[in-house]
Amino acid sequence: MSQRVSDQAMAEVIAETRTNSSSRRHGGGDDTPSLPYMHKVGAPPKQTLFQEIKHSFNETFFPDKPFGNFKDQSGSRKFVLGLQYIFPILEWGRHYDLKKFRGDFIAGLTIASLCIPQDLAYAKLANLDPWYGLYSSFVAPLVYAFMGTSRDIAIGPVAVVSLLLGTLLSNEISNTKSHDYLRLAFTATFFAGVTQMLLGVCRLGFLIDFLSHAAIVGFMAGAAITIGLQQLKGLLGIKDFTKNSDIVSVMHSVWSNVHHGWNWETILIGLSFLIFLLITKYIAKKNKKLFWVSAISPMICVIVSTFFVYITRADKRGVTIVKHIKSGVNPSSANEIFFHGKYLGAGVRVGVVAGLVALTEAMAIGRTFAAMKDYSIDGNKEMVAMGTMNIVGSLTSCYVTTGSFSRSAVNYMAGCKTAVSNIVMAIVVLLTLLVITPLFKYTPNAVLASIIIAAVVNLVNIEAMVLLWKIDKFDFVACMGAFFGVIFKSVEIGLLIAVAISFAKILLQVTRPRTAVLGKLPGTSVYRNIQQYPKAEQIPGMLIIRVDSAIYFSNSNYIKERILRWLIDEGAQRTESELPEIQHLIVEMSPVTDIDTSGIHAFEELYKTLQKREVQLMLANPGPVVIEKLHASNLAELIGEDKIFLTVADAVATYGPKTAAF
């Protein structure tokens, strides 16, 4: 790194620095600077232990002050506000009118036409009978409409969570047709809801943010490909298909059945409707006004294919069909949940994982559409709403539900105004359960497979992956790790890799924070990173280091060693350039939001090491928390009060050469 000092003042600066620096050796504040600084670093008012704990608790769990409007209210008013807090529909419902209902009614009918065929297909991903998908789109949306805060999110089963649930449950009970498998699905749904509700009630929603965007992109893409590969069984009419989900096992199963297991009529039906679905998606993507074409196309596929199989009796020639679907509303499943026994632990494990993944997807969808309409959602209320609907769902024969991106997008484009669109959709699903389900008897499984493949195509976000590569290579590695983990091993392995890489990135950033050498921008008193601003000039006889992180036990030793390494490297370069040796080391602490006892100890060791090297340590702009701890630990006294400055410019003006001050 080359020394950046203006040429015209070089000789004068060197002479002055060598003359004056000998009288300014470090000494804990014994020397009197020639140019006093104008401002001292202020210390915050002293707080009691209780005040500190209260402040930290409120900032961690109640940063949005959710109960601020309860203050100074009567008891009856507080009761009303409490009900409105739990059930937001009681608040916005007061302003509901016919115009809003018109938009919600149209949107509800539109997403119902999309959700019914998807529900039949997604239930099969979870290794459940098709009617459980319909059950899940009846109860859960009703609960969410009363408790949720998003106007646009559409609730129901989704592909990724269905696949995750089916994979994890089949690992516990291989016979997916057994009654215990169904009971375990309800148990997992119950504990998924409990997990989500606890996160909301305890206001621990920030925990789901530990799964990075990059990991989610990779996981979703891998899950989409895995889901698509699983549908080859229905699309090709294969009866003897592997139970493994990795790409190697699936492709081996496909090719081993190529001569005897494929059914040409099934392939013709499946591919025809898949092409139709993809064409309608393309039309809707190119012309947003024609979104309804893509929305109703799955229902058209189900109706046309069912009629075709019925009149041709293709089921007699090897085309597999849905067969019987139960009619009627959801039966109670409260007695089916494992609250004890050998499957309780499995239900808790699967439920926690499925609940967190479902919650992550729902929050991402809710925030996306809220930003598009310029309103905000309450994350903790969303978690409570999601948890409640899954707990209630587990008691009414539903499996894990969450926000669906495809349905929410259609809901948004159809002009929904409030969550009432979910109520309209639920009513349509109820009518379907009561009246229409027998008509699905001849629906070919190949069409359901086509609907699933068309639905998950958009989950493979190539543009997002390319953007990750351009912006952050580590994020791209996280994305690819999750992606390959899903397609080559399993969904749970991919999810584990996604979480592990997300935590690894956090640990890497915490334990190895960035540091930078600062220089003065010509003609200003501003000091910036000399790598970012090549024209920035370093001050003769001084080294200015900025630490870009809080200083904790996990990184304090690294920061100390990195500062000393900067000192050695810069000192060697200045010696080679015959420039003044470094006599003052300034640590710019503006980005340092906090410091713990390990950080204090590291600075004490740094101070002692610099004393041996006859280099004077100075600090610039420590924040309120940091300066308070510096005084409490006596580190400020050790360094010297006159060595702690409000700005780098003050430190340079006080101890640097006069020509560098201006």
UniProtKB/Swiss-Prot annotation:
The lineage of its organism: Eukaryota, Viridiplantae, Streptophyta, Embryophyta, Tracheophyta. Its main location: membrane. Keywords: Membrane, Transmembrane, Transmembrane helix, Transport. This is High affinity sulfate transporter 2. The gene is ST2. Belongs to the SLC26A/SulP transporter (TC 2.A.53) family. It comes from the Eukaryota. It is found in: Membrane. High-affinity H(+)/sulfate cotransporter that mediates the uptake of sulfate by plant roots from low concentrations of sulfate in the soil solution. The chain crosses the membrane at residues 103-123, 128-148, 153-173, 182-202, 205-225, 264-284, 291-311, 346-366, 383-403, 420-440, 447-467, 481-501. GO terms for molecular function: secondary active sulfate transmembrane transporter activity. SUPFAM superfamilies: SpoIIaa-like. Signal peptide: none annotated.
